[in-house]
Regions:
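Phosphate-handling catalytic cores of nucleic-acid transaction enzymes
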Residues: 1-192
Length: 192
């Protein structure tokens, strides 16, 4: 037995990439209720983007590493910034207009959780969705090197991402709507 490890203010990011069949057999059948009631799934931003297999043909005209190089450069800048901060935390705030966007979003989602509300079957996730919106807006703010408070535009982008991930959660956690576009449209987290 080794001595314990003391972590101060730990952060954890997990990226799990599994095939749909493994996901549905592992999480949506026998373990579904345990996973759902424990809130495990609700702590993840889940998605299954449309496959591009069969369309990823590379020709001399359509291949460029330009965006990969820009992405790599930005990631390295973020790593350098993080190391330079020596554990200091940067606290982000919404501008007054962005805070209003967040509040309106929170209230809209909250109003759909109760009784016969459209989000009553995914309360465990929807209750956290406004928090995800704030975190996503903060990430976008930081990644794009914005200064000052989080802008209304960035808050709206965070909201749109939170809505998209919320809809993906509902689609992926319900085998009846998995890969059923017609039914998906009726299960929108926030109607368009």
């Amino acid at each position: 037995s080794s001595p314990g490890i003391n972590l101060k203010e730990p952060r954890l990011t997990i990226s799990v990439m599994i095939q749909p069949d493994v996901y549905h057999k592992g999480f949506c059948t026998r373990k579904k209720e345990i996973v759902k009631t424990s809130g495990h799934h609700a702590r993840f931003l889940m998605c299954q983007p449309t496959s591009t297999q069969g369309t990823r043909i590379i020709t001399g005209d359509n291949y460029s590493s330009q965006y990969q190089e820009l992405f790599d450069k930005r990631i390295n800048e973020l790593i350098d910034e993080s190391l330079a901060m020596s554990g200091e935390r940067r606290c982000l705030h919404f501008s007054p207009q962005a805070a209003r966007i967040w509040t309106d979003y929170y209230n809209d989602v909250e109003s759909k959780l109760g009784g016969l509300g459209p989000l009553r079957h995914c309360r465990e996730y929807a209750a956290k969705n406004a928090e995800y919106m704030a975190r996503l807006a903060g990430l976008l703010h930081h990644l794009s090197s914005e200064e000052g408070d989080i802008s209304p535009y960035t808050a709206e982008m965070g909201r749109e991402l939170a809505i998209w991930y919320g809809n993906e959660y509902m689609r992926l956690s319900n085998p009846l709507t998995f890969d059923n576009t017609a039914q998906n449209e009726t299960m929108r987290l926030i109607p368009e």
